[in-house]
């Protein structure tokens, strides 16, 4: 199964050859961080930048994770997937490589966002906070990457997947605790937020910063990651055996 490393290297090289793409993927989360943290007036008891930064980190990983489906769809449409399947390597290594790649990319982007947040006034936290944040974001990335990959294997072309990505990403983000505390939500919205994986990623990171226990949110993310890996693996085997 170590063969997945070659697929990770391939995607990292392809990403590195497109510096404009690397820059563009950072602009939106950085703009959201500056706008929500410094410009938009919000009634919040405390440093709102400390509250909103985890939400921006989660949005960054959400965007990167869903790109696993885009990459899978491109490989499928351009015929690379069939060529990879002909290689003497476990077919699951293709899927694992995609998930690991988008997780690495999301963590690199999140690191830049954390640095920007510190520059504009977010509180400095302990080393364990940043290590724990990376672990939480990695788990969350696996969940989202599996959702994206499963969707791309179920859809027929890139345009359809792009529509799915647009339809899913913003509702997931806004119907979570990324920008608004759970206690400030209307009752109907709380029910949606409780079913949203972004809420658990946000809550776990914020718990690290406030000294509360993140274990419940981490457990939920761990279960979701395991379930989505099983579903995505099943879908990938079924799609590539036909």
Ranges and model annotations:
Residues 38-46:
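Short, hydrophobic transmembrane alpha-helix segments
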Residues 23-29, 156-177:
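Pore- or pathway-lining transmembrane helices of multi-pass membrane proteins that form conduits
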Residues 91-165, 212-233:
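Alpha-helical transmembrane segments and their short interhelical loops
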Residues 6, 10-14, 79-86, 153-156, ...:
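Short amphipathic alpha-helical coupling elements at transmembrane boundaries
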Residues 31-35, 49-120, 140, 148, ...:
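Hydrophobic alpha-helical transmembrane segments of multi-pass membrane transport proteins
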Residues 14, 43-44, 123, 173-227, ...:
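Membrane-interfacial helix-loop-helix junctions in multi-pass membrane proteins
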Residues 1-28:
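Aromatic- and glycine-rich beta-strand/loop motifs that create alpha-glucan
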Residues 236-242:
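Short cytosolic juxtamembrane segments of multi-pass membrane proteins
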